[in-house]
């Protein structure tokens, strides 16, 4: 599931606006360069030629992008509502449906070709996104060494008063041991009630065992 996108009703407006901006920026740049190149000689004429072509062609390009984005998001939201899930298949099917819908005025063959192109393009985009996500996850997970964390106030106390820092650490260990003792005291009677009196398991339960704090002390982590 994609958590960085808006919910479905708002997603249509968002994708339509983003597609319109992409068409405006990309179309303006492309048409300006095209008009600048095809204009007569002279810098001023070339600039005017590029600007005139931008004013004539960019609105239609931006509108086409907006229609494509709105249609794609509408089909995507319909698939999400029908399938009750969000995955790559929704995008692939939405791309195919969008291509077919926008080419419906040109006949069945044009619809099939546009649907195939949209399906292939969205499949490549989803595959590239999945590959990048897998590579990033592998890079982030490699070579990570987990170090024991310390409380922030311990580092501050060490710089101010080392003796107070050690006493604070001992107090924390004592509190931790006290909590463990309470847990053991409340847990052992409940366990022994379910075991028969003359049972080897009951004898083994009554034997002393090391607590978590004892194991930490034996490992000399502190």
UniProtKB/Swiss-Prot annotation:
The lineage of its organism: Eukaryota, Metazoa, Ecdysozoa, Arthropoda, Hexapoda. GO terms for biological process: protein import into mitochondrial matrix. It is found in: Mitochondrion inner membrane. Belongs to the Tim17/Tim22/Tim23 family. Component of the TIM23 complex at least composed of Tim23, Tim17 (Tim17a1, Tim17a2 or Tim17b1) and a Tim50. The complex interacts with the Tim44 component of the PAM complex. It comes from Drosophila melanogaster. One of its GO terms (cellular component) is TIM23 mitochondrial import inner membrane translocase complex. This is Probable mitochondrial import inner membrane translocase subunit Tim17 3. The chain crosses the membrane at residues 16-36, 60-80, 115-135. It is a multi-pass membrane protein. Keywords: Membrane, Mitochondrion, Mitochondrion inner membrane, Protein transport, Translocation, Transmembrane, Transmembrane helix, Transport. It holds the Pfam family Tim17. Essential component of the TIM23 complex, a complex that mediates the translocation of transit peptide-containing proteins across the mitochondrial inner membrane.
């Amino acid at each position: 599931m994609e958590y960085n996108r808006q919910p479905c009703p708002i997603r249509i407006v968002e994708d339509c606006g983003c597609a319109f901006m992409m068409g405006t920026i990309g179309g303006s740049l492309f048409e300006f360069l095209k008009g600048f190149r095809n204009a007569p000689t002279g810098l001023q004429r070339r600039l005017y030629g590029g600007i005139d072509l931008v004013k004539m062609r960019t609105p239609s390009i931006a509108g086409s992008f907006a229609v494509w984005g709105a249609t794609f998001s509408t089909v995507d939201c319909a698939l999400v509502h029908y399938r009750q899930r969000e995955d790559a298949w929704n995008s692939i099917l939405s791309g195919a449906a969008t291509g077919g819908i926008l080419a419906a005025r040109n006949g069945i063959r044009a619809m099939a070709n546009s649907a195939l192109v949209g399906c292939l393009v969205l499949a490549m985009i989803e595959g590239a996104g999945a590959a990048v996500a897998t590579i990033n996850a592998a890079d982030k997970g490699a070579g990570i060494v987990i170090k024991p964390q310390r409380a922030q106030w311990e580092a501050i106390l060490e710089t101010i008063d080392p003796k107070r820092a050690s006493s604070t650490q001992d107090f924390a260990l004592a509190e931790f041991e006290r909590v463990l003792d309470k847990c053991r005291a409340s847990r052992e009677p409940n366990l022994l009630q379910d075991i028969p009196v003359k049972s080897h398991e009951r004898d083994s339960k009554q034997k002393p065992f090391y607590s978590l704090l004892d194991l930490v002390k034996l490992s000399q982590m502190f």
